[in-house]
A protein has these predicted regions:
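Residue-level preference for beta-strand/loop junctions
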Residues: 70-72, 87-89
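Short, aromatic-enriched amphipathic alpha-helices that serve as compact interaction elements
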Residues: 1-11, 18
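Hydrophobic/aromatic beta-strand elements that line small-molecule binding cavities or substrate pockets
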Residues: 59-66, 78, 90-96
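Short beta-strand edge/turn micro-motifs at domain boundaries
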Residues: 88-116
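A solvent-exposed, acidic/Ser-Thr-rich amphipathic alpha-helical stretch
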Residues: 14, 20-71
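Short hydrophobic/aromatic-rich beta-strand segments that constitute the beta-sheet cores
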Residues: 25, 76, 104-105
């Protein structure tokens, strides 16, 4: 849940503090597969591209968490506005901690879905 809140707030310093220095990160968006192995790469090479400067997160609408064996599942939905209009974005993240931080993470993203 802390990751979803920090990401939706575009608080990348807070995101960085949550990530283990040797994070194993992989993500899947509708058009691309993403990989990163350290917090700076996750932030600059992935998250800042997923939520660009022009993307205004209007609301973190829904967050749910659960446990799947040794992984935590975090599902979250955001309303986003940018010059192209209003969108909803949903992501499912699976997380494992290492030394009290996120050390393993897999994220699947719906992409920016236009709102009528």
């Amino acid at each position: 849940m802390r990751f979803a809140e920090a990401f939706a707030a575009k608080d990348f310093d807070r995101v960085r503090a949550l990530l283990h220095p040797e994070i194993d990160f992989r993500g899947l968006t509708p058009r691309r597969f993403w990989e990163a192995g350290d917090p700076d790469s996750v932030i600059t090479g992935v998250l800042r591209l997923w939520l660009e400067d022009s993307d205004e997160v209007r609301a973190l609408e829904h967050v749910e968490t659960d446990t799947v064996a040794d992984r935590e599942r975090v599902g979250y939905r955001m309303r986003v506005r940018n010059p192209d209009g209003d969108f909803v974005v949903e992501q499912q993240a699976y997380i494992a901690e290492r030394d009290g931080r996120i050390g393993w993470m897999r994220v699947v993203c719906s992409g920016f879905r236009p709102l009528d």
